[in-house]
Regions:
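Short beta-strand segments
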Residues: 24-26, 65, 89, 120-123, ...
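Short acidic, glycine/serine/threonine-rich loops at helix termini
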Residues: 35-42, 99-100, 130-134, 172-174, ...
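Solvent-exposed alpha-helices and their adjacent loops that cap or buttress functional pockets
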Residues: 2-5, 14-18, 36-37, 54-57, ...
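Phosphate-binding glycine-rich loops and their immediate beta-loop-alpha structural context
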Residues: 73-189, 194
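Glycine-rich beta-strand-to-loop/alpha-helix junction loops that act as flexible
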Residues: 27, 123-124, 184-204, 211, ...
Length: 367
């Protein structure tokens, strides 16, 4: 008998009887080699044979009840993975299936990129830190900081939520200066990027040597979003300092979530050599309060200005082999409850002025 883990063995022919040689072998054991010139090239399951003992010679034989063929139940080296096969491609996120593959060929370590380090800061004098009394009517709980932190962590970033900074220029500048010295790859703030008197982020980051790449884009929600590179001017060797990516997101929670999904996360994918997400496609369902009829099979679901890209929370469903999606009707950049009941975003492209039931739309996962 040959068991799994045994060294390969050589089997000699039975010269006395002249009968073909067979060997009992366990799953995972190496096939034996024959010194008689006849290759042992087939394995028959134990369930498909009967062992017969010759009472005269005490020799054991097997009787096979099912047809056998060459290479049956035999696994050859290289029949699964071959030399030069790619197990994990550059830019892929390592998942358990990759671990199964690399471990099976004896690889115990693989080179990976480090997680991007991200600092998250909420701005707003009206915000309450977590755990404080919510009874004052002029204060609200900070929703953006925890949401941004949780989403970024789920997407593979190493995130530090650094708290709330009030709407005052000097404390805000000091806080960002301190964060810049800690070597983060990306800094994200929420709030204070629009056009109000206390929207201080654009002016403050310019005082910190920021190179603003864009501020205010043609998208809804999230129009005020800002992206900049902040140069570290503290280098003492005359060489250019490192640049830190900075995203200023709007304060309205759903607008902040949209900018995170369609501005920040694509940038993090770029840092990690990953491909941007491609949209899936789904058929748009009519609203619950609209009844289709023979006279109006494809009612208008929603209308748009058409001068910018619009991202709307939606609920995707599968039905009869087709992916269908329902637009969340009760939407507002500042209302969180409708967002809670969504699981995807619909991208309404610039130039589209209306969507009708039955239209095929682009959808993206919520994060």
């Amino acid at each position: 008998m040959i068991a799994a883990g045994d060294e390969p063995v050589r089997i000699a022919a039975d010269e006395q009887s002249g009968a073909p040689v067979c060997v009992e072998i366990m799953t995972g054991a190496p096939f034996p080699t024959s010194v008689s010139g006849d290759e042992l090239d087939c394995c028959v399951r134990n369930e498909d044979v009967t062992v017969i003992v010759d009472e005269t010679s005490n020799r054991r034989y097997i009787q096979v009840f099912k047809p056998a063929k060459a290479r049956q139940n035999r696994r050859f080296a290289g029949s699964d993975f071959k030399k030069s096969d790619i197990l994990v491609d550059a830019g892929e996120v390592v998942h358990p299936g990759h671990i199964l593959s690399v471990a099976s060929v004896g690889i115990t370590e693989i080179a990976v990129m480090r997680k991007p380090r991200v600092a998250v800061v909420s701005t707003g004098s009206e915000l309450l830190p977590p755990g404080l009394d919510q009874s004052p009517l002029h204060r609200i709980s900070d929703a953006n900081g925890p949401y941004l932190t949780a989403t970024l962590e789920s997407c593979g970033a190493a995130v530090d939520f650094l708290g709330i900074v009030h709407d005052h220029a000097e404390p805000l500048k000091q806080a960002l200066s301190s964060i810049l010295r800690k070597g983060y790859d990306v800094i994200i703030t929420s709030g204070a990027v629009s056009a109000g008197r206390f929207d201080l982020i654009p002016a403050v980051i310019r005082r910190l040597n920021a190179r603003v790449v864009f501020h205010k884009v043609a998208m809804r929600p999230g129009h005020p979003v800002l992206f900049a590179q902040i140069l570290d001017s503290s280098s003492s060797d005359g060489q250019p300092g490192r640049e830190t990516a900075f995203f200023g997101l709007p304060g309205n929670p759903v607008a902040s979530a949209a900018c995170l999904r369609f501005s920040v996360l694509p940038y993090l994918k770029y840092l990690q050599l990953q491909r941007p997400d491609d949209p899936s496609h789904a058929y748009l369902l009519p609203p619950d309060d609209v009844e289709t009829s023979t006279t109006k099979e494809h009612p208008v679901v929603s209308t748009f200005r058409g001068d910018m890209d619009v991202f709307r929370p939606a609920l995707v469903r599968g039905s009869s082999g087709h992916v269908q999606v329902k637009l969340i009707q009760d939407h507002s950049p500042g209302k969180i409850k409708p967002f809670l009941h969504s699981n995807c975003w619909i991208h309404i492209h610039r130039g589209v002025s209306e969507l009708k039931a039955g239209d095929i739309v682009d959808i993206y996962p919520s994060h």
